[in-house]
Amino acid sequence: MRFLVVIACLISGFTWSQIVNIENKRIYDDTSGWSGSLDAGFSAQQNGQLFYNLNFRPRVQYKTRKNHFFVLGDVAYTGSNAQTYTNSGMMHFRYARRIKNGPWKWEFYTQIQYNELLNQRLRTLGGTGLRWKFVDTNNIRFFAGSSFFFEYEELQSDGVINEAVRWSNYLSWFITKKGLSFTGITYFQPQIDRLDDFRFSGQYTLGIGLTKRVDVRLEYNMFYDSNPPTNIRKMVFSTSAGVRLKLGE
């Protein structure tokens, strides 16, 4: 069981450590001012060994008609006296300025993160680019974005330092109809001076209302790195399916 926990942490952690899906973390709220949440937790369990878990996940925005400030974080530690299963953290800050009250925004962002189990001592990046909302109806929204960012990464075991400028592109959508919802985000991030070195990822969720009381939810996540670190697969993916039964009126 512990082996499965470690493998799950490594797979999800590697994907998360390379491309953070900001789209599904955004707060889609037209209200001006402050909104969001600050989540923190701690748990401990004694079962032969003492296992404990810590996490801190802020997601806060401040929004006006022209300006949008957004802070996202995810800090987690899971371990025992003998072994560490998760020791990772990420903080992301983003500022967006609407252009002439239109569908375009100019964004600036920066990020810092670490992941002990993935040999990542430090990764930082900073970038800027455009975001375009090109479909906006009651039931359908489509967004596209393109930006350039510089990333710096230090590996902890061998002291390797990686630096690169990447071109980040994404397409996201939110579709809701009666009894159906479909959301997705696709990222493509080639390295500017080596276009054959690229990352591609996607997260897609489909919700289907079978009856008034029964819903089905399907999710697929994938990540592909054409030039991954040593001993890491080029492609990882995960799928999940669930059923929800509504009771009462």
Ranges and model annotations:
Residues 34, 66-71, 102-106, 138-142, ...:
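Repeated loop/turn-to-beta-strand initiation elements of outer-membrane beta-barrel proteins
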Residues 1-32, 248-249:
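Cleavable N-terminal export/targeting peptides
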Residues 235-249:
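Outer-membrane beta-barrel "beta-signal"
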Residues 40-42, 71-77, 91, 108-112, ...:
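Transmembrane beta-barrel strands of outer-membrane/channel proteins
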Residues 42-44, 60-64, 97, 132-134, ...:
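Residue-level signature of outer-membrane beta-barrel architecture
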Residues 32-34, 50-54, 85-89, 122-126, ...:
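Residues that define the transmembrane beta-barrel architecture of outer-membrane proteins
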Residues 18-61:
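Short glycine/proline- and aromatic-enriched beta-strand/turn motifs that initiate or cap beta-hairpins
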Residues 38-40, 56-58, 91-93, 128, ...:
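Membrane-embedded beta-strands of outer-membrane beta-barrel proteins
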